Amino acid sequence: MGILYQASDPMVWAIWLFVVFALMAFNEFGRTSVWGGVALFAVAPIVFTIFVWPNTAAPGNEYGTGNWFNWVKTYSALAGCVGFMALRFVKWRGADGREHHLYEKRWALCFPPLILAINICEAVIRDVQMFGYGLWGGAVVDHVWMISGPWNIMNAIAGVLNIITICGWFGIFISKDKSRDMIWPDMLWMWIIAYDLWNFAYTYNCMSDHSTYTGLALLIACTVPTFFTKRGAWLQHRAQTLALYAMFAMALPQFYTFAEIPTTHNPTAFFAVSLVALAANGVLAVYQFRRIRARGLNPLKDEIYNDTEKYREVVEENR
């Protein structure tokens, strides 16, 4: 990976691989166990907020974890985890004597796309902010090496396109199995890959030497389960792995001092990564717009891909 990264020590990559598998393992624990999810995404954050993070992630700390973005990203990811658990498990008995579930309420189904869009928007703002720093020759910001350039604006546009192409949230349902996963069948592989490319470009642009973890590791940890463990539950996988890593990084910022994998600091690499992300999201936006127009759909109400084989496979597996 000499084009993007310059680390050659096998031990560093072994640590990186361990992080990937640890994220997938804890995600699976939080997914398949209700109490595991409560412990990881409700109890642990409260404990960390009171006793740990005020010391390890204080503003201006030497590891760069005390900036506004890390705090906001951590709590927005946790909000997603808790909200998705509510959709999966909250139920009550109504005046009609019947059992009702939160996910049956259409207003509740607006939460997943909303928190996702907010999460992407946070990163878009950070990319624009990085461009505004004017670090054309590169410099250290929040104790991490950064460089400003047109790639920040390119990737910000890709992020906006990624938000625009979020679709089909009224088709979200809860799986029939014991884990009761939040299934979003209209969120197919095209959007997921476009998101992954955009998000990796964002981490490469704005977290540079930390991007093998905040970008590659996190994206692999949520994308692999989506395709091979529990299809249709990408957003649930993404929120949980992101929250897990964010909590870990806030609690143990020293991790980067011995396991950091620096980028090549090559402007061409930054430009290329963001160009790929912009192209992928541009193609997705055009393709999706054509489908919407051809089928006469309302993207705010209708599912875009419910006539595809992949959509039907996800529904059949989980409903």
Where are these regions (language model features)?
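C-terminal transmembrane-bundle signature of multipass membrane proteins
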Residues: 17-24, 214-318
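Central hydrophobic cores of alpha-helical transmembrane segments
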Residues: 37-44, 111-115, 191, 238-250
